[in-house]
A protein has these predicted regions:
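Hydrophobic alpha-helical membrane segments
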Residues: 1-249
Length: 249
């Protein structure tokens, strides 16, 4: 029977990886967060500007109730667009960070370039398939959630390893087009019997999250890389080199 690491062992692996290099880990996660936040602000500002230009001035609102409704709809539309855009950016940045952590675990002496590494998912090599995985998993999870919230959560964990599988398969077969749907299916198969274990791993960070909030958010600078890297450590433990060539060991 295959033996897998405990939550404590996975976290210990992450802390050992970051020993003396927490600065690299923090910068790797911080820069995408700042970019996403700036993009969010830009979209909000542009949306409000468009709303103001296409509607009657404020002093005329009392003469036409429909105008204020239009402004409200425009504002809500702008907020919705900014939320969706920032959500997609945040998800893709997280994928790029996870890719970097995967390389880092396999090469503990890897030199980290925060901007370049966190943006790697936007390269020609990864972007299209990674984006398709995001779209497909979002659709599948939403459809399952329509039945009841629990099936949606279960599917979220079933699909959780698709991005890392995609990265490994791209490395394993660089001249082949990797199917996003196949990566999702492979993740479902890989996570059979392990979804609860992964769920408990993520829940184990709740206490750290509370402390990060109490520190006025400063603690998240350490928590985000710690949590993201531990998820990758879980994948490494789960696959045990399944998608690697012999020369990669």
């Amino acid at each position: 029977m295959e033996q897998y690491k405990t939550r404590a062992e996975l976290k210990s692996d992450t802390k050992e990886l970051f020993r003396g290099r927490w600065k690299d880990a923090i910068l790797l996660n911080l820069i995408p967060t700042l970019i996403t936040f700036i993009a969010f602000l830009v979209i909000v500002v542009v949306s409000f500007s468009i709303a103001n230009q296409t509607n009657t001035p404020i002093e005329n609102w009392t003469n036409d109730s429909y105008v204020s409704e239009d402004i409200g709809e425009s504002t809500n539309s702008g907020n919705g667009t900014s939320n969706v855009t920032s959500g997609i950016l945040s998800a893709l940045f997280t994928v790029g960070i996870s890719f970097t952590f995967l390389d880092w675990f396999r090469d503990p002496y890897k030199k980290i370039h925060p901007i370049k590494n966190s943006l790697q998912v936007f390269s020609r090599k990864y972007f299209l398939r990674a984006f398709l995985i995001y779209i497909l998993t979002s659709i599948f999870t939403t459809l399952w959630s329509l039945l009841f919230i629990i099936p949606g959560i279960i599917k979220h964990y079933a699909y959780s390893q698709a991005y890392l599988i995609y990265k490994d398969q791209t490395h394993l077969s660089p001249n082949e087009k990797i199917s996003s749907l196949n990566c999702i299916t492979e993740s479902k198969n890989l996570m059979k019997g392990h979804k609860w274990r992964f769920f408990l791993l993520e829940m184990s960070f709740i206490g750290w999250g509370i402390l990060a909030v109490l520190s006025l958010g400063i603690g998240f600078l350490w928590l985000f890389p710690y949590e993201n890297a531990t998820r990758v450590a879980f994948y490494e433990d789960l696959t045990k080199g399944k998608y690697l060539n012999e020369q990669d060991y």
